[in-house]
């Protein structure tokens, strides 16, 4: 969450994951981070697939995240993400559906959409991001359905009591 008083973009992320005596570190710049500008009070999400790991499967992990943020001018269009619904489909594909609405008076040809998943206690359990191939004029709304292939949380619809989204529209 941007608890400051100016727009920011996350310019670097360092994750340290530890469990069962093993630990791994991943450092990266989030995709399209120059366009993902959080206004004061906004909450954003970062998702990263780490691939092969030395952390034993099924172990409880400890995650330490260090973020570097830089002041940015607000850019692009805000995209409201609402009417979110998760479905676990046969045989094992989870889908996320909802509606995207572009900010009045702004247009965009590209976008990044983020969703955060929370359990019944309001505890954050994971995030997903995607880009929807859609041109928006100011005020346009478009429905979407995306397959969440390889999402690591099985039966997400049973575990996520709340889904929150945020979207960013921009032109290259």
Task: Report the location of each language-model feature.
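Hydrophobic core residues within well-ordered beta-strands of beta-rich domains
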Residues: 44, 94-96, 111, 142
């Amino acid at each position: 969450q941007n608890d400051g008083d100016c727009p920011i973009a996350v310019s670097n992320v360092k994750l340290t994951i530890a469990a069962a005596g093993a630990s791994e570190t991943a450092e990266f710049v989030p995709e399209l981070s120059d366009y993902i500008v959080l206004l004061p009070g906004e909450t954003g999400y970062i998702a990263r697939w780490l691939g092969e790991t030395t952390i034993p499967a099924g172990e409880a992990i400890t995650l330490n995240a260090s973020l570097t943020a830089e002041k940015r001018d607000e850019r692009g269009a805000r995209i409201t993400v609402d009417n979110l619904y998760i479905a676990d489909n046969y045989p094992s594909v989870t889908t996320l559906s909802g509606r995207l609405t572009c900010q009045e008076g702004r247009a965009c040809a590209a976008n990044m959409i983020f969703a955060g998943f929370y359990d019944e206690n309001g505890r954050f359990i994971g995030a997903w991001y995607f880009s929807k191939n859609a041109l928006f004029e100011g005020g346009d709304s478009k429905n979407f359905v995306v397959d969440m292939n390889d999402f690591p949380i099985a039966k997400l619809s049973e575990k996520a009591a709340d889904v929150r989204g945020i979207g960013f529209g921009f032109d290259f």
